[in-house]
């Protein structure tokens, strides 16, 4: 996704802001005190762009059998972004890979990338699935997107409709909502669980000092945040007529046994990896 512009106030604006800070509600003042300017335009420690060679690293980690799963198969890369992952899957042995995204700039970059790797005919980029493609894919991939879908039931149903009856949906995403950085606000503070310590209005108010998109709710931030907890995801899977065939819940600091604790698991599961099939 394209990075948002950071707000860099002039000295005069800073003085006015400091005066206004004195009348700021206490929760906002507390959150602001533990916040900081992002280190770069991405708001992350690094802006390094993914390459085709590294694009499958997360999927290979999440699913030990990943390359066997896609070998000789028809694969749908749901939310393909710039297409590095789509191209990488074709190079790793997939028979055909379709990259699906609504961003036309992403799709064009993906097409250019496929041409560079001489994959015309084996890789396609599109913003919608044709009727004839529904029910035709062996594997559907969704990586680091599930927590962003504001209408997750509809999205899961679309993914399911793309699979043939014996197909498999591989979903990996994180952090879920109640994880230490489930609010996705680590660009402005390294303090964990701020979505539990501060109300939504407080977090959004302080966020305005670092992002200028006008978001007043979590769902309005760039990419959207659907407050996707682990339990919510598991309910959605059942609601869509699917079941979890295999799962790997990764917890903070590698303490995966915490993922087995009722209720408390929500605080420690940092990444969700699931293989889904139709019930």
Question: Where are the regions a protein language model picked out?
Answer:
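Conserved N-terminal segment of class I S-adenosyl-L-methionine
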Residues: 1-135, 139, 143, 226, ...
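Acceptor-substrate binding/catalytic loop of class I
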Residues: 183-187, 216-232
């Amino acid at each position: 996704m394209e990075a948002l512009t950071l707000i860099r106030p002039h000295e005069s604006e800073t003085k006015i802001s400091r005066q206004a800070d004195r009348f700021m509600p206490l929760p906002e003042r507390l959150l602001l005190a533990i916040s900081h300017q992002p280190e770069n335009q991405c708001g992350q420690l690094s802006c390094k762009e993914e390459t085709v060679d590294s694009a499958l690293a997360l999927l290979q980690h999440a699913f030990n059998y990943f390359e066997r799963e896609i070998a000789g198969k028809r694969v749908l890369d749901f939310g393909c972004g710039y297409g590095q992952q789509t191209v990488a899957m074709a190079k790793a042995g997939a028979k055909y890979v379709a990259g699906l995204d609504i961003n036309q700039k992403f799709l064009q970059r993906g097409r250019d990338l496929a041409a560079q790797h001489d994959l015309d005919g084996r890789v396609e980029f599109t913003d919608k699935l044709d009727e004839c493609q529904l029910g035709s894919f062996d594997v559907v991939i969704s990586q680091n997107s599930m927590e962003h879908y504001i209408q997750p039931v509809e999205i899961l149903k679309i993914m399911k409709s793309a699979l043939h009856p014996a197909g498999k949906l591989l979903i990996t995403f994180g952090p879920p909502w109640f994880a230490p950085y489930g609010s996705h606000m680590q660009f402005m503070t390294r303090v964990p669980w701020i979505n539990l310590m501060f109300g939504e209005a407080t977090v959004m108010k302080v966020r305005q000092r670092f992002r200028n998109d006008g978001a007043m709710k979590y769902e309005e931030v760039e990419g959207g945040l659907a407050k996707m907890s682990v339990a919510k995801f598991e309910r959605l899977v059942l609601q869509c007529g699917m079941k979890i065939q295999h799962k790997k819940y990764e917890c903070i600091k590698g303490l995966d046994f915490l993922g087995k604790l009722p209720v408390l698991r929500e605080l420690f599961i940092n990444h969700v990896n699931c293989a889904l099939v139709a019930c």
